[in-house]
Amino acid sequence: MELDGNVAPQTVASFIYLARDDYWNDGGCHRLTTSGIYVLQCGDPTGTGTVTPPYGFGIENPPTDGNYPRGTLAMARSDDPNSNGGQFFLVYKDTQLPTEGGGYSIFGQVTEGMDIVDAVAQQGVDGGAGDGAPKQPISILSVDVAQKT
């Protein structure tokens, strides 16, 4: 993944902080959506979708048209626009998300590994619904941060 601190400095700083703190190590991706919205949501170290870091921050760099192209890396949040924290999502198919409430912070792009996200998405949601835990479990073993050269 490539992060863009120029457009979302607070989001990228938080992501780097959490990565260096091993926040996501051995966590999972707990949510897959397969109808209308096409994202794989990750970032809760327990894999339940209920845990966030002990802080939150506001929305940065949301698209005004609500368009999130394939490969987008964006922050997940609750209805509270200041609830960005540790959960994020990977867009695996061009997706239109509501702009009401401020949208979602785009802070990077997936540069490698979309084939893995596609494989998880192809398996669908556990139980067959359009939104829920991925049928194919996926884990984040570790996250390393490196300066782009």
Question: Which residues fall in each region the model found?
Answer:
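Cross-family detector of peptidyl-prolyl cis-trans isomerase
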Residues: M1-T149
